[in-house]
Amino acid sequence: MKLKPIEVAEILQKEIANINCLSELEEVGQVITVGDGIAQIYGLANVKSGEVVEFKSGVKGLVLNLENDSVGVVIMGDDNQVQQGDNVKRTKEVLEVPVGKALLGRVVDALGNPIDGKGDIASKEYRHIEMKAPGIIERTSVSEPVQTGIKAIDSLIPIGRGQRELIIGDRQTGKTAIAVDTIINQKQAHSLTNESDKIYCIYVAIGQKRSSVAQIVKKLEDAGAMDYTLIVSATASEAAALQFIAPYSACSMGEYFRDNGMHALIIYDDLSKHAVAYRQISLLLRRPPGREAYPGDVFYLHSRLLERAAKMSEEKGSGSLTALPIIETQAGDVSAYIPTNVISITDGQIFLESELFYKGVRPAVNVGISVSRVGSAAQIKAMKQVAGSVKLELAQFRELESFSQFGSDLDPATKAQIDHGKRLVEILKQAQYNPFPVEEQIVSIYVGTKKYLNDVPLQKVKEFEDKMLTEIRLNKKDILESIKNEQCITEETEQKLKAFLENFVKEFVK
């Protein structure tokens, strides 16, 4: 059968119309040099700083340096997969990470990809990792407490929702232990139905050993705390670029809770290693070094991160993001570059001392140097009632203790004050992974400040406290309930507590 020319033309027109031949315009450059996690790229004239680019192998990179004839890119992954001469294309996107409640209970990398082998994360919402910090009008002052469950902190260095409180100390002094205890202590609030009491937790491991991160995950799972916790891990074996962006990614995940009227707590463990990763990147990009070879913008690196922690105003939903950055010092030197930077950015610091740690005072908090600049406004009235004098008494005790080393002839009043100070130090000691509810902390500190321990031998103070709290939980629950509900110690409650303690001390000393 012969086709007429007009029919052939119609068939061709139909076929041409069905061809899906959409041409896409891509901006492509070439890798000039690559090494140490950094690639120099030629040909991407319109690329922007902070933009994501994609290499031929599928590995992503982040543009950090814009030069006259080339672009400096940090490689977010294995740089062995990037070769000289490879093509690189623009994505015209900035870095985004998944956010939302679907991430809770999971361990993710710095880009939000799951690394715990529990399958994909069903998150529908994404956020940029670099977000502008809330302005002054959008914020309100800190007024609600974050209970850490640690007596020495909740009584003397209270933390409020929306605060930035630095945990600083030498290696192996219990910095991470304080952070993990704080996460575990939120379990009680999560057992309640009231959303405003709950605090969702995010732990960011920067430059840590993988074994340490695995240990923390195991501990949180055993304590039942992973249900409301998310872990972002950028371990020491990963690219410096991933260690550099991990805190920003985690902060965006925390901001989801803050901006939706919920409360979140984020722990950066630790920002010393974060600064080292950024120094490595900056030096490889040939940026001019400054003090201790850190780049000039290392202050801005941390300030733009920590300023994102805030307590939002009622119009913005009253949510909050509380930050607990951790800094590791060398031989107790808090006057080094990074420690002084972060101290000046944060609203206070908890200073841990190795000397106290080795003496068996744990948590090894140095009460004299530690301070909370805004937390006292968030402290509940009951805690203020009992802990008001503790800081002064401990400071006087430390002074008298160092003075008493020079002479043994002390008058009875000084001796009594030193004995009282020793018992206060003893009552503030606490085992790891054993956070206390705030009402039990108040009773313990009341016992210490009101000198009920004066007749108890020093080595038996811990035993006294354990037995006393067990007894009060079993037979005097109304005292604890009253403190918890009223948020203060009423006259009636105080009378009951005094009567109970007088009897208990007599029985115990027998």
Swiss-Prot record:
What's its EC?
7.1.2.2
| Membrane spanning residue stretches | none
Q: Which UniProt keywords apply?
A: ATP synthesis, ATP-binding, Cell inner membrane, Cell membrane, CF(1), Hydrogen ion transport, Ion transport, Membrane, Nucleotide-binding, Translocase, Transport
The UniProt record lists the keyword Cell membrane? yes
Keyword Disulfide bond on entry: no
Report the locations given in the UniProt record.
Answer: Cell inner membrane
| Summary of subunit composition and partner proteins | F-type ATPases have 2 components, CF(1) - the catalytic core - and CF(0) - the membrane proton channel. CF(1) has five subunits: alpha(3), beta(3), gamma(1), delta(1), epsilon(1). CF(0) has three main subunits: a(1), b(2) and c(9-12). The alpha and beta chains form an alternating ring which encloses part of the gamma chain. CF(1) is attached to CF(0) by a central stalk formed by the gamma and epsilon chains, while a peripheral stalk is formed by the delta and b chains.
Function, as annotated, reads: Produces ATP from ADP in the presence of a proton gradient across the membrane. The alpha chain is a regulatory subunit.
NCBIfam families assigned: atpA, PRK13343.1
Please state which protein family the record places this protein in.
Belongs to the ATPase alpha/beta chains family.
What name has this protein been given in UniProt? Answer: ATP synthase subunit alpha
Q: What gene is behind this protein?
A: atpA
